Amino acid sequence: MTVKKWKHSGTKKHSMSDREIRNGLLSEKAAEEGIVLLKNDKKILPLNISTKIGLYGAGAGKTVKGGTGSGDVNNRSNISIYQGLKENGIQIVSEKWLANYESIYAEARRAWKEKILEEAKFVENPFDAYAENPFAMPEGRAVTAEDTVDAQTAIYVVSRISGEGKDRRRVEGDYYLSRREQEDIRFLDAQKIPTVLILNSGGPVELTDILEETENIYAVLNISQLGQRGGLALANVLLGKVTPGGKLTATWARRYEDYPCAEEYSYLNGKLEREEYKEGIYTGYRYFDTFGVKPLFPFGYGLSYTEMQIRFHGMKTSGDGVEVEAEVTNTGETFSGKEVVQVYVSLPQDESGKEYRRLAGFAKTKLLKPGEKELLKIRIDRKTLAYFSEEQHAWIAEKGYYAVWVGNSIASLTLAAMLEVPESVILDKTNILENQTDITEEVYDRQNLSARTLKWKEKAENEKIGRYIYYPEPEKRTECTCQPENKIPAKDLLPLFYGNIAGISSNLGAAGIRVPGSAGETTAALYEQYGVFPLIMADGPAGLRLQQNYEVDRETDTVYGIGVLGSLENGYLRTDEIHENADRYYQFCTAFPVGTALAQTWDTALVEKVGIAVAEEMEEFHIDLWLAPGLNIQRNPLCGRNFEYYSEDPLLSGTMAAAMTKGVQSRPGCGVTVKHFACNNQEDNRMGVDAQVSERALREIYLRGFEIAVKESRPVAIMSSYNLLNGVHAANSVDLCTAIARKEWGFDGVIMSDWNTTVPEDGSIPWKCVTAGNDIIMPGNAADAENIRKAFEDGKLSEEVVRMSAGRILNLIHTLTAE
């Protein structure tokens, strides 16, 4: 076997490469498509290029490109909203305010850096000091009348930073507007300046009061976090060069208290060791829509500069699902635009209890000129039309009538058709899981739901809505094709089960050896004797997280290390010195929009293109496995890593992850690692929290996205999560790793742990990871090696298990490293 070889990753050239330019433009395109227009009163947008703009708010000049931790990208540079507007010729009249904020920000960053470096001296893991002290955007000085002179329109940018290791806080300046933000916005309102409010945050910020109590906030845009060229992307939308077409992927509540089980999330109830998912299947819009709780902005919502008409054109049924046809026409007169057609279904209501509607499929049009139309075909998988029965341990397509709704958000739907299933059909008989929860789920009042169900049935009858007979057929399982390794002595295979031990301990992926800043590597212990080459991994999911630059000693050819902190924040926390007689290598990766922003495009073809671009950079920097995409459910808006994830909906999450996977893995030698499997829905005490989830909620909500991604795109790897699930660490869970992933879904790739899951005293047990089907412990340490060796010698870790797990690992290594 020929393997990939190189001397040093990156290039000595500091100049921007053609690849950087090309992928930067793709990042900008994805950013444009992910911007969501939430309000546009008096059609204030798009702006006239001659409009004099007063630009304010923390994110105006310091726009947040993405979240912190492993989801960050150390790219070359970023274009802020201020820069984007200036490059487009917009006259900014608030330069003094912006310059003053620049100095405030610089001082806040300096003080924050000093605090991190000081606290890092007294902790075993420097990343803990970083995670416990997330940087908060400082407040600027108050906006005054002097700052608004000549301003014809105000743009106010609310920015938030969140990241790995800590959940967002329910305080002013985080989930709520800060006191200064409120005062500034109210001041602009009192000045009667038409205002555009920009939300530059990885998740919702509560806006209800400020929107209801002011008169001059004419427009609101949720831009999420748009990567390195977000400022240009937003300018293109504000000026009408691009018509906004993004849609929300999570519900924005009027009040935090409106979210299900809101007061019991994470740290709020004081029980960080146990998280009870009492809401069951009623997450996000499933709760709001089912029980009539009005949100501020609903799931799937997003406005445009033009008007679109959606007409249902018919439906076809087959044993494996349904195909809906819908025609979209741009009925506007001025702007071209795109539309997302969303199809929802209502399942038969019975004693099992179901949500009122669920997203069943979607498609996005091409760019339609005024008067232009397009016919879309939207496929609905049979399992999307089923529910999971805990009593029968099966997915069941239930006898009865199903409503099919078509529109462009959960709040804007038309009853289009009715499906009839003559007899109940078991689609998939599942394995009985060993670990179940003992929690009692919330019991919600379903009286209104029954009335609404009756109402749509009457409407279908009175309006003679088309009725289609659907005969679902059972799923055929894909058998796992894993083969054991039978040639190499079993004891020599043991190092495969933990990463290439580098002596670096971090919950952040920074244990790479051959590519500076890479997350880690599989073992090199079998290379000399058996030619087994180690795989190199890099964090994601907004691009590759590598060290931006590094030095190599010219005489010894050794790389100067910078430590875990040095790999963060584009090297801002680096303390290393510049060395004499050393060459500097550069690794400039592209910072794409965060996962949420990509999902807000609702454009699978575009996400696949982003995946191809990521793979191109993997090839350039010798990365075999990308530790992405992340597709945990956005269960609560306070989760610190929601920005990495796609949606509160499992279908949308899984479909986006599948598109990204297809893109990356279309390039030979490039693989993804879908994560975090499963229920990694909070960051506080993420390594010790026990997620208590009913099997139905687990399968319908929290595992469904993984199932879609595995079956549609065949990712080569899965990463298990830190948390316990119903009493067992995910990396030690036979239910997750073997019973579900391998035996039910036919997953034949490798499952690896998240970083240092075995390090805590009550963490995952190394040898039990292997027996559960979690093949590799990352990044690996001496204690892992000793625990596995002893378990093998004692017979707790059998030779059969060793050979089967090794077979999966060696197959992956061969697939990704052979040329």
Predicted regions, residues:
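Glycoside hydrolase catalytic-domain context in secreted enzymes
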Residues: 1-388, 394-410, 427-819
